[in-house]
Curated annotation (Swiss-Prot):
CDD domains: LbH_AT_putative. InterPro entries: AcTrfase_PglD-like (IPR020019), Nucleotide-diphossugar_trans (IPR029044), PglD_N (IPR041561), Trans_hexapeptide_repeat (IPR050179), Trimer_LpxA-like_sf (IPR011004). This is Uncharacterized protein L142. The keyword Signal applies. Keywords: Signal. Residues 1-19 form the signal peptide. Belongs to the mimivirus L137 family. It comes from Acanthamoeba polyphaga mimivirus. It holds the Pfam family PglD_N.
């Protein structure tokens, strides 16, 4: 098959993050994007491209040139098998180097500054991402994702459905079979035959199956399989069931008191779970205050971590909750929020639930932001919150940070299974990526309810101790931190 496309135009499937890279390469190669098919988005997308229909519409476009932009290997395979008899073309950057002796199949992505060297073979529907190098005599199967800056030595054989993480190295003469995930920065020094997740240098297997990491009930069935098709949400009475509400707090006593005073007003609707990262104010002030709320039954549970592990506290608390008490049959919805918010609409819970139930393709609803105290002068990156999103009638399609995130509990469990399987952490950017690029669903935010971000008031003062702490410890957000915690509960 020809390495480069002879088509003058192409249709794309799915409008996610990887699609933007694909669009850049096709347009740089002079290939017109005739339209994009996506089940969850409409209208204009990136660089003037248009979403013109849903995936089922592709049956009307048989024999036309197509490219699937999905990053997930399994979903890419499913789409390739269900859209009918289209012509799958390759997307190859002009800035990639491919030896004339290389044999390439169909539906492959080869990104900028990547290299495929002498006598190598690349099957179908693979992603060779930016800066990756496949040296001589490699044999690559189908539906693999070779992430940016991966280096693969000579005579390596890679099967199907593998993910080789960013900046990984695969030594020469290695076999990587099927359904293997290699973590970022790993070094593969011997062949990997058993499916699973491998990390480190040299890489070692850390988990056998995706579902092993996050199981809950005594029969040990993975929740991912047991509850994904749960129909209990169809009963509108579930709207009145209590909602577990995870609130993460840290250090700032006045802000914590304002936030928890706000949320505890709704404890007839919320089972409030406070998560605290230990700080200098914990023992003297914060812990006594939170324990008083617990004793008065204004909150349900209190996780106290012995160190400041940033957003990993969400991750560890949710892991524990899923294994012990977060039952989707009892709690159809779960709320997760930062502990520095107040919300200006007393009906904010109902608004978020109504948004979730108005469209089955909505994955998460969150509160919009009150930007009146946005610290744009001291934190220029905060300007990202000024974006307006797309007005969809009763909601705005757009993401936020972790500002009152409402999800179906089954989706929280599904998300945690995914994050654990990829050795990732609970971050808003990763939730957004999973929402759009794996679930093909929508992140919605409220039109009426707005969250006031109390910490932003502090960020306006660069000399404030909390602002300095955030600046000095910003690197911690990228660290996989863990520690022990105490759990206090009613």
């Amino acid at each position: 098959m020809s390495i480069t496309s002879v088509s003058l135009y192409v249709y794309l499937i799915c409008a996610g993050g990887h699609a933007k890279q694909v669009i850049d390469i096709f347009l740089d190669n002079g290939i017109e994007i005739k339209g994009i098919f996506d089940d969850n988005k409409t209208g204009q997308f990136y660089r003037g491209t248009q979403i013109i229909g849903v995936i089922s519409d592709i049956t009307k476009y048989q024999s036309e040139p197509f490219f699937c932009t999905v990053g997930d290997n399994q979903i890419r395979e499913k789409i390739s098998q269900t859209v009918g008899n289209v012509e799958w073309i390759n997307c190859i950057s002009k800035l990639a180097y491919i030896s004339p002796s290389v044999v390439i199949g169909k539906g492959n992505y080869v990104g900028t500054h990547s290299k495929i060297l002498a006598d190598s073979q690349l099957g179908d529907f693979n992603i060779v991402n930016e800066g990756a190098t496949l040296t001589h005599d490699n044999i690559i199967g189908d539906f693999n994702h070779i992430a940016p800056n991966v280096s693969v030595g000579g005579r390596v054989k890679i099967g199907n459905f593998n993910l080789i993480g960013t900046n990984s190295t695969v030594n020469p003469d290695i076999l990587i079979s099927n359904n293997i995930i290699i973590g970022s920065g790993a070094t593969v020094v011997k062949s990997l035959v058993d499916p699973g997740i491998y990390i480190g240098t040299p890489c070692k297997k850390i988990i056998k199956n995706i579902s092993d990491k996050c199981t809950c009930f005594p029969d040990n069935k993975p929740l991912y399989n047991e509850y994904t098709e749960d129909k209990s949400m169809e009963n509108t009475e579930n709207n009145k069931q209590k909602i577990p509400c995870f609130v993460l707090i840290y250090d700032q006593v006045d802000i914590i008191k304002k936030c928890l005073s706000f949320f505890t007003k709704y404890n007839s609707r919320l089972d409030i779970i406070v998560i605290e990262n230990f700080s200098q104010n914990t023992n003297e002030t914060i812990k006594p205050y939170v324990m008083n709320l617990l004793n008065k039954k204004k909150i349900w549970k209190y996780y106290l971590f012995e160190n400041n592990i940033m957003n990993n506290a969400y991750h560890m608390a949710l892991q524990h909750a899923i294994k012990t008490y977060l039952d989707p049959k009892k709690y159809p919805y779960t709320l997760i929020t930062d502990g520095d918010l107040t919300i200006d609409n007393e009906d904010w819970i109902e608004e978020q639930i109504n948004i979730m139930e108005s469209n089955k393709n909505i994955y998460v609803s969150s509160c919009s932001l009150d930007t009146s105290n946005l610290p744009t002068e001291t934190f220029p990156e905060a300007t990202s919150w000024t974006k307006t999103g797309i007005d969809r009638g009763n909601y705005i399609e757009d993401n936020t940070g972790i500002f009152s995130l409402l999800l179906k509990t089954v989706d929280v469990i599904d998300l945690m299974v995914f994050l654990d399987s990829k050795n990732l952490r609970f971050l808003d950017s990763l939730i957004n990526h999973y929402c759009y690029n794996y679930k093909y669903k929508i992140w919605a935010r409220t039109k009426k309810s707005k969250a006031y971000h109390l910490t932003w008031d502090l960020y306006k003062d660069l000399d404030h101790p909390y602002t300095k702490m955030k600046r000095e410890n910003i690197y911690l957000w990228s660290q996989n931190l863990t520690c022990k915690f105490d759990l206090f509960e009613n």
